[in-house]
Amino acid sequence: MASTLAPITSTLAAVTASAPPKYDNLWMLILGFIIAFVLAFSVGANDVANSFGTAVGSGVVTLKQACILASIFETVGSALLGAKVSETIRKGLIDVEKYNATQDLLMAGSVSAMFGSAVWQLVASFLKLPISGTHCIVGATIGFSLVAKGQEGIKWSELIKIVMSWFVSPLLSGIMSGILFFLVRAFILRKADPVPNGLRALPIFYACTIGINLFSIMYTGAPLLGFDKLPLWGTILISVGCAVFCALIVWFFVCPRMKRKIEREVKSSPSESPLMEKKNNLKDHEETKMAPGDVENRNPVSEVVCATGPLRAVVEERTVSFKLGDLEEAPERERLPMDLKEETNIDGTINGAVQLPNGNLVQFSQTVSNQINSSGHYQYHTVHKDSGLYKELLHKLHLAKVGDCMGDSGDKPLRRNNSYTSYTMAICGMPLDSFRAKEGEQKGDEMETLTWPNADTKKRIRMDSYTSYCNAVSDLHSESEMDMSVKAEMGLGDRKGSSGSLEEWYDQDKPEVSLLFQFLQILTACFGSFAHGGNDVSNAIGPLVALYLVYETRDVTTKEATPIWLLLYGGVGICMGLWVWGRRVIQTMGKDLTPITPSSGFSIELASAFTVVVASNIGLPISTTHCKVGSVVSVGWLRSKKAVDWRLFRNIFMAWFVTVPISGVISAAIMAVFKHIILPV
C-alpha cells in the first residue's frame, strides 16, 4: 500500500514545490480585501461629518447634495493624495524588516489591524461617537505588533510624533479657524453694509481655496497625472497662476452676478420659513395693534406686537409662534428675561423689545386669546431677520439641557434623533416619533405642543441658508399632518442667562451675507472632502496595501508604489459608508457642538482643510476629526462661550483616548488567534 501511494505523494510534493508560494495565503488576501472594505465603510460612516457636517448644519446643502458632492471628492482625493499617507501607515509605525523571515505573520497582522479598527469604528458609528479613524488604525497596528514581535517591532519615536500630532492638529486648526473667522467678522460681518467688503474679499477667498488645493495635488506628486515630474518652482508657479486666474474670473463675472442676486433677493425677500411671517412696512406694524376682541379673527402666526417707544426705522421682522404648555406650570412673566418684562396689558398681552448690540430690534409678544385651549398658551417672538432667535431655537432643541429655557420646570428634553432633520422637523411641526416622557409618567402624557396653525395651506419658498435644509425636508411632507407633540425646551434661555442668548445673536449672518458665503462654504466643503479622502483613505487601505504587496512580492521592504486601484477601492467603501450611515455623525459635528452659519462654516472648513492637506503632503497621519472638532469649537467659542456644548466636547475628547486602547486590544486578540492557532509554528 505504501509503495502504491509513494508515486502519488512524490508527484504532489513536486507540484507543491513548483507552485508559486504566494498562493499559500490566498485566503488571507481575500479576507483582507473584505475586511478592508468594511473598514472603509466605517471610515465613511464616522468621518464623513468632517467634510460636509458644517455645510449641512448651516443649511447650505441638503444631506443628499452633500452625499453626492462628497462621493465625488472623496474618491478623487483618495486616488490623488492617499498614496503618501498610506506609506506612513504601512512603514512608519512598525519596523517591517523584523518580518523578513515571517511574511505570513505580517500579513496576519495587517488583517488583524483592519479587523480591530473596523469593529470599533462600526460600534462608534452606531453610537454616533465621532472618533478618529487614524487613532483606530494606529492603535490596531501597535496591538498586533506587540503580539507578533513584542516591543522591538514598534518605532516608538514615530509613535510619539503621531501622538503629538493628535494634540497639535486640533490646536493648530482651531487657531487658524479662529483667526480667519475673526478677520471675516471684523471686516465683513460687523459692517453696517457687509456686501461691499464681502464682494471685495470673494476673489481672495476663492483664490486661496483653489491655489491651496492645486498645490496640494501637484506637490504630492500624483503619478496618475504626471505631477511627480514637476519641480517645486513649477508647482508653485502653476498654483499661483491658477489662483490669480480664478480671482479674476470671480471679480469680473461672479461678483457682479452675486451683487445683483443679493439685491434682488433682499428686495423681494419672500417668507423664509413656515414659522416666520415677514413684516416689511410700517402698515403691517400698525395693523397688528388691534383690539383684544379681534385677536380671534386673525391667524396666530401673523400676530406681531410692535416695540414700545418710538420706532427708529422700518425693520424686517419674523414672527415665531409656539404653544409652550400649562399656564400654571410656567407663568407668563417667568418665561421672559427680566429685561423684557416692560409692560403687561389687561388683555393678557406682554409687550417688550430689546435693542441688540448691532442695532437689530428684537420684539416679543405673549398673547392668550379665546382661541387657545385653557391648558396652554401661545408665545409669539417677533424678531429682526438678522437676529439669532431662529438659530437659537434650533440650537435649544438639540442641546437638550434641562432648565436652559424653562427654568426649574423639570421638563425632559427632546431626545436626539438619528436623522439630521429631527431639529427642523420639530421646528416645522412635522411628524417626529422620537420623544421622551417625564419620569414616572407614561410616554405621551402632559407633552408640550408645538403647533403651526394652518400649516397645510401655507406654501414655503426656499430662500436662504437658514432654512434651505428645513424647506428641503418639508417638501416631502407637504400634505402630512403638521400638528405634533414634542417634549422640547423652547424660549430665550433661563432667567439668569438671557444676556448670553443675546450675545449669541450678535454674530448671526444677515441674509445677504448668507447668500455671499454659501457658495464659498460649498467650495470649502468640497476642498475638505478632497483632503479627507486623501488623508483618511490610508486608514482603511494602508494595511491592505501592506498585505497585497507582501503577497505579490514576498518582500516586506518592497519599494513598489501604492496601486491607484487600491486607493479607489477604499474610496468606494468610504462613499458607501457615507450614504448609509453618514447622517448619524453629521448630527453631532454639524449641529450638536455649536450652531453653524455660512460665514463661520466657511472659516471652519477652509482652515481645517488647509491643516489636513499640509499634514497629508508631509506624510503625517493626523486626524481630520481632531482638526474639524478643534475648528468648530474654536469658532463657536469665539462667537460666544455659551454657544458651544462643552459637555458634548468633553465626551468627544474622552472618546479620543479610549479609541487607541480599544482598537489595539481587539487587534491583539485577533493576532493571538492567528499566531497560536491558525498559522503553523
From Swiss-Prot:
Residue ranges annotated as transmembrane are: 25-45, 66-86, 106-126, 162-182, 201-221, 234-254, 513-533, 561-581, 602-622, 652-672
Where would you find this protein in the cell? Answer: Cell membrane
Residue numbers bearing the Phosphoserine modification: S269, S273
Record membrane topology: Multi-pass membrane protein
So what family is this one in?
A: Belongs to the inorganic phosphate transporter (PiT) (TC 2.A.20) family.
- InterPro entries assigned to the protein according to its UniProt record, in alphabetical order: Phos_transporter (IPR001204)
Q: Where is this region: Disordered?
A: 266-295
**Catalysed reactions, semicolon-separated:** 2 Na(+)(out) + phosphate(out) = 2 Na(+)(in) + phosphate(in)
Q: In which tissues is it expressed?
A: Ubiquitously expressed.
Keyword vocabulary terms for this entry: Cell membrane, Membrane, Phosphate transport, Phosphoprotein, Receptor, Symport, Transmembrane, Transmembrane helix, Transport
Name assigned to this protein: Sodium-dependent phosphate transporter 1
Note whether Cytoplasm occurs among the keywords: no
Tell me the organism: Rattus norvegicus
Which Pfam family, any one of them, does this sequence belong to? PHO4
Q: Where is this protein chiefly located?
A: membrane
> Which gene does this sequence derive from?
Slc20a1
Q: What does this protein do?
A: Sodium-phosphate symporter which preferentially transports the monovalent form of phosphate with a stoichiometry of two sodium ions per phosphate ion. May play a role in extracellular matrix and cartilage calcification as well as in vascular calcification. Essential for cell proliferation but this function is independent of its phosphate transporter activity.
